Amino acid sequence: MTDKELSQQAKDYFAQIRKTDRLIQRLKGTVATLRSGLTSQSYELKPDKVQSSGAKNPLESTMIKILDLERQITARIDELATMRNDTFSMIKNVPDLDQQNILIGRYIQLKNWDDIAAELSFSPKWVLKLHGKALLEFYKGNQEFFEKRLKATCEG
């Protein structure tokens, strides 16, 4: 594989963190929307009627959806924490500390390039150049992991 392809493998791995974080944010947004719907609706309390079929109580149905989404969010947060811990351990295999800082800032802390550049007192252009080198070093430092991952993808 070319250096560009190796770097892309590293980027694809890192993308999982951002995608999982976005999914968590979307699920939280859905919960917030459902909760606001609960407070904006008026529910009329009536004695229970016996029906052979029909819709459940909308309040109960919405609460069940919220609880289910909150369980999903908790599971995804646990998954994200594990991914970040694993990734942090893998980043330690990059020998250059500036490159480590860039990878941590971008992929674990999910910062933008300008913020990373300001924190490191580098120009954004230099950060991007170091980032390219860091991706390649990340792949090389974790080559066995990526080879197993590629093999599993090909077999699955």
Positions of the model-derived regions?
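N-terminal positioning helix adjacent to the helix-turn-helix/winged-helix DNA-binding module
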Residues: 83-86, 97-99, 130
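Short coil/turn residues that cap or connect secondary-structure elements
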Residues: 91, 95-98, 126
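Short amphipathic alpha helix immediately N-terminal
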Residues: 95-111
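Short alpha-helical "recognition helix" segments of helix-turn-helix
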Residues: 115-118
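DNA-recognition helix of helix-turn-helix
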Residues: 121-141
